[in-house]
Amino acid sequence: MEDITRHLSQNIGPRPAGSSSEHSAAQYIAQTMIELGLTVETQPFYFLGWEPTRPARVELLAPETRKIPAGSFLFSGSAPEGGIEGQVAHVGTMYLCRDFFEWPKYAVKAADGSDLAYLVANAGGPAITFVLYELGRLFGRMPYVVLDLATHDYFQQQLAAGNEVRVRMDTAGVVKDGLLSHNVTGVLPGSCLPEEEIVVCAHYDSTLGSPGACDNASGVEAMLRIAENMAHGPKPAKTVRFIAFGAEEYLMFGSKFYVATQKEKGLLDRIKNVVNLDMVGFGDHLAVTVAPESFKRRLQSVFAGMAEAFPVEYNSNVLPVSDHYPFYEEGIPVAMFLGWPYDDYHQGTDSRDKIDPDMIRRAAEAATGVVRQVAGR
């Protein structure tokens, strides 16, 4: 199999949902699935997106003057031309995603004390491009910008010392209605229980401005390697559906649409397990989020029997951060494979040269073992 991660991240490049490059990636994945002998189905869907019209920028005006690293928030409101200037005040924590993305929040204040805009610091480090989760989008169309953790630390030091912190910030974007994306499915029919299904999935879009090598071309490559392993080995008893989801970076629109339509058709109860591969191209260990406990025990038995052992960290707290979550909400056993840590997450530096091909191979082998175990023979 060719270097799929290289093709998606380098030859095609950034693949924001609804773009022509995302559509090119969908066609490439569909063709690869056909070459593997899978029966391919494509599910188009429309969604509400957002595109930047001015980049996120923050300039420190007091107690010193300098530029501050800034990232865009998808679905942010727009600042007026010329930006917004005001005093910075710490206003608490923004709970973008419970137990995971809980970030320090600052307001840019007008002279009368009203909030003009918000600066939210990435507790994990750099000023990345990120999305305002449902909670963040409920409170009007205020301008939001992502800061880095170092700026948060600086603000805390200055405010604790009683110093005034002033900034000028700018960001602008437009909501785009009717953007088109696709879920691409490759089907490997079951030999004796074809009405029961195992879903193996990975999203193929990337965040704005990022080549998305690790997030998530690596997951797509791992998924297709599993498909290759399954197609060339003993046929599974249950049907295995390999799904490349679109628009994951826009709040998992692709997987949410797929789950909703399967539920409408009365087909959701066919799905017995879901294995999701997201960012498996780097890291010193494999982080596996899995629920319920019975599914975790099956994973552990598979990993214990593998000839090539590698560090695995288990977590049972399933969060709305990737495409396994809509299935989990419907009570379906799920597992997400993630390589961690990865310092180039959601940045323009998430490129092919950062990828460890051996990590992809090992993740694919581990997941293949799990899929074979739950799909039966």
Predicted regions: what is each one?
Residues 46-48, 123-127, 151-152, 175, ...:
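Solvent-exposed loop/turn segments at secondary-structure junctions
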Residues 3-106:
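Noncatalytic luminal/extracellular "stalk/propeptide" segments of secretory-pathway proteins
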Residues 61, 75-90, 132-213, 225-228, ...:
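Soluble metallo-hydrolase cores and metallopeptidase-like ectodomains found primarily
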Residues 3, 7, 24-35, 150-154, ...:
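Extracytoplasmic/secreted proteins, especially bacterial periplasmic and envelope-associated proteins
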Residues 180-183, 206-302, 320:
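Acidic/histidine-rich catalytic neighborhood of metal-dependent amide-processing enzymes
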Residues 7, 42, 117-121, 146, ...:
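Structural recognition of the beta-strand scaffold that forms the well-ordered cores
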Residues 137, 282-377:
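Active-site-adjacent substrate-binding region
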Residues 1-23, 36, 43-45, 55-57, ...:
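N-terminal capping segment at the start of a domain
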